[in-house]
Amino acid sequence: MKWPKIRLRRVDVERVLIACSAALVLMLSVRGRNMETEPYEEPLEQIPVSETAASASAKALQQTVVYYEDGDGYLVPVQRDVERQDGIAKATLGLMVQSARNDMDAARLGLTPVVPEGTTFDLDISQGHARVDMSHQAMETADRAQEENMRTAIVWALTEFDTVKDVSFLVDGQKRSALTHGTDISGSYTRVGLNQEEPAQETFAGAQEIQMYFPAQDGRLLVPVSRTIYGSDDVATAVFEFLRGPKTDSGLETPLPEGVQLLGVSVSGGTVTIDFSSEFVKIAEQSDGGVQAIRALMLTCTRYPGIRKVKILVDGEPYQLPTQEVPTFANVASEVETQYPEVMTIE
C-alpha cells in the first residue's frame, strides 16, 4: 500500500543530520586513538542474540504521552513505552526537548520536538498543581506559534498524569508574565484549547469547546482538534461536528465520504449507535479501507463518559466496520512506526 509522504521542515532534518554527523566523527576519532594505543585482546565470547533480546525485554517499561509538533503546526500526542523510572513526569518533558536522539525519535513519526534545544526542567508537584521551572533556553523559540505550542504541550503532557490538574511556569527560578514572543505564562493552565480552531465569528456567552480527532494528510496520525460550539457538549453534537469535518484550510483530512448524512444518534448500555446515509459505504474506497477514519470517529465518541463501543448503521442496517477494536489512544509510537512505513520529504 502506498502512503503519502511525510513533510518535515528542512531546518529540523538539517539539525538531526548535523548532530548525527558530529557524533559519528567523534566516535571514529575515539576509536582511532584506541586502535593506536590499546594492545590486542582476544575477542569476548559472543552473547547469543536471543539472550540479549530476552534481557532487553525483561526491562520494566511504562507508558507515557509525549506531545510533538507536525509540519502543519498541530500538537500531536504520542504514547511511548519508556523504561520504568522515578520522576516519569519530568522525564516526559525531557523527551520533548530538541536533541539528536529526540529529533530522530520524532522524525520516525513525521514529527518534531517542541521545546528548544538545551532546555532543562525542575518540576514540583503538590496537591494537584505542577510548577515547572524552565531554564533560559526555553525563551529561544522561533516565533509566537512555537512558543504557544511549547506551553500547551507541557501543560497537556503533565496533566496526562492523574496527580496533575493544573500547571504554572517559572524561568530560571523567576516568575515571568510572558515568554519572548508574548505568550502568557503568568497564571495556572489546564487542559483546554488543544489545537483550537479559529472561531468563524466572535464567541459569546454559552460557547463550549468540544474535542474531535481527524486524520492527518499523510494518513499515519490522528490529530485532536478543539472546536467552539453553541449547544450541548454531548456525543450527538460531537458526531455532527465530526461529520462536518475539519476546516477547509486545516491541512487535515475529511474522514467521511462526501455527501454522507447523519440520520440518527442514540446511546444505550455504553454503546453509541450512529446511523448514516448510504454514501457512508464509500469509506471502503479510502487508501486504508477507512480504518483511520473509523478510529477517529471512535476516539471522538469514547471520550464521553460511559461510552465504550461504537456501532454503525447505514440506512438503518448494521454495517461491518473495517476495524472492530476501539482504540485506547490516538497514536501509539510502536504501531505508527511498524504499520505505516514512510519516506520522509524535506520542505
Residue ranges and their predicted role:
Residues M1-E347:
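Bimodal "functional hotspot" detector
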